[in-house]
Amino acid sequence: MRIRSGDVSQPAEQQLLRDYFGYRAAAFPQAGGYTVSLPDPSQFDGARGVFLVVDDDSGVPVGCGGIRMLALDPARDGGAVRAEVKHVWLDPSTRGRGWAGELLDALEQSARALGATELVLDTHHTLEAAARLYARTGFVPTEPYNDNPNATRWYRKPLGDLGPGGSR
């Protein structure tokens, strides 16, 4: 498995996003439907965010995730520089291998490199495996920070200082 930089305007990345949105849309009808909102590629341009791709051992793209920096709102954020985790998805055939945790680690490292002091994300209550992953990796429930029509849960993770050697 390899995690690499991606470009949401490229065909392979667009296919991953179609797979992601298709998976979500299929799972959400019972929960009131799912609204597809394709990402603006400029959100992941390297200065304002990144988009990462997970390739399997054969080099086939099987997952993705992104980080986008959010506009500062001192009243809301209390001085935190927030980065939002977006579009985390792995093909169901790859699940259970720990790759989602590795992808989240890589996204966190990218957010730190962009100057973030806090990660936030939103998800849906039907995605229980995702909720367990987020809890296991240090995310805690928080108040809604956006008006995403697909979200029913919001999480945050402070990015405290790294200890000696770059670890916590």
Where do the language-model regions lie?
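Loop/helix-junction capping segments adjacent to catalytic residues or to phosphate/diphosphate-binding pockets
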Residues: 11, 97, 128
